[in-house]
């Protein structure tokens, strides 16, 4: 498999879910997955705020990415297509400065 392929990454995460029987043991429960993603985001935040090495940050981001791919599997949606649909919407938006920082979102004051 091509390690740069979305399908290869998704297949690896699916194999991990299957190996540990996530579907039958609560590992695919969406509320649980949200809690795990929040935990990983906290670890990413700690890497940034504590000035940890780039490798530590990369590992935590990979953990979050794996959880996101697993959530797409659990919730049965096509993350690849959803990504491209969302990018198309984002590309159509105008950027603006808010509190001295660029935003390209539907941020409202």
Give the residues covered by each predicted segment.
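Flexible "arm" and connector segments at domain edges
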Residues: 1-61, 65-109
């Amino acid at each position: 498999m091509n390690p740069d392929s979305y399908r290869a990454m998704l297949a690896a995460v699916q194999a991990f879910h299957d190996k540990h029987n996530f579907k039958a043991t609560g590992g695919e429960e969406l509320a649980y997955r949200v809690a795990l993603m929040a935990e990983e985001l906290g670890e990413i935040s700690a890497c940034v705020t504590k000035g940890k090495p780039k490798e530590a940050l990369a590992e935590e981001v990979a953990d979050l990415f794996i959880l996101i791919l697993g959530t797409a599997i659990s919730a049965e949606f096509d993350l690849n297509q959803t990504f491209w649909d969302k990018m198309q919407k984002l590309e159509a938006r105008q950027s603006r400065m808010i509190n001295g920082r660029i935003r390209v979102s539907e941020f409202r004051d």
